[in-house]
Amino acid sequence: DTYFVVAHFHIVMGVSAFFGMFAGIYHWFPKMFGRFMNNTLGYIHFFLTFAGAYLIFWPMHYEGIAGMPRRYYDYSAWESFKQFESLNAFISIAAIIVFFAQLLFVVNFFVSIFRGRKCLVQNPWGSPSLEWTTPINPGHGNWPGEIPTVHRWPYDYKDDGHGNDFIPQTTPLREGEESH
């Protein structure tokens, strides 16, 4: 029951969940708001968060392997754990940096809603899945008029013979073609 458990749980469950949420927000932001988030701030946010997460949790793995127990608020009573005081200070500094990186994300999010570069195309990522066939800022029911018919698997990436590496789900299959 050491710091290894804390580090491993948070790097696997916590960090992966947050990166999934951030990826979804960056990906669907143009569809939700009709604008793009700032790319430069997005890259800074990603690299600070990525590096910071590992600067927090890899030293905790090391402390856990060295036998440092979790759920203790003060390690000064044990001489063997005093060697980790500077490492714990380093972890705290890394956590503060990661916190400020999240503030950068929040600023990027809200500023981009009003001042982000306008998304002028319906499908900026060239994604074949159905949600990108709706207009930007879709109204009630998502699609104006008739609901589109799905003919393909949502991730059917392949050359359509015209230089496109994707074919939307709504494109009918050609004769002899199969959806994978």
Feature names for model-found ranges:
Residues 1-5, 20-46, 59-84, 107-127, ...:
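Juxtamembrane membrane-water interface segments of multi-pass membrane proteins
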Residues 8-18, 83-101:
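Hydrophobic alpha-helical transmembrane segments
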Residues 10, 51, 61, 106:
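Divalent metal-coordination and catalytic microenvironments
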Residues 14-19, 46-57:
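Hydrophobic membrane-spanning alpha-helices of multi-pass integral membrane proteins
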Residues 19-29, 58, 97-106, 140-154:
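Juxtamembrane/interfacial segments around transmembrane helices
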Residues 49, 104, 130:
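A broad, low-specificity signal marking well-ordered, structured residues that form hydrophobic/aromatic
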Residues 66-83, 112-180:
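Extramembrane terminal tails and long inter-domain/linker segments of multi-pass membrane proteins
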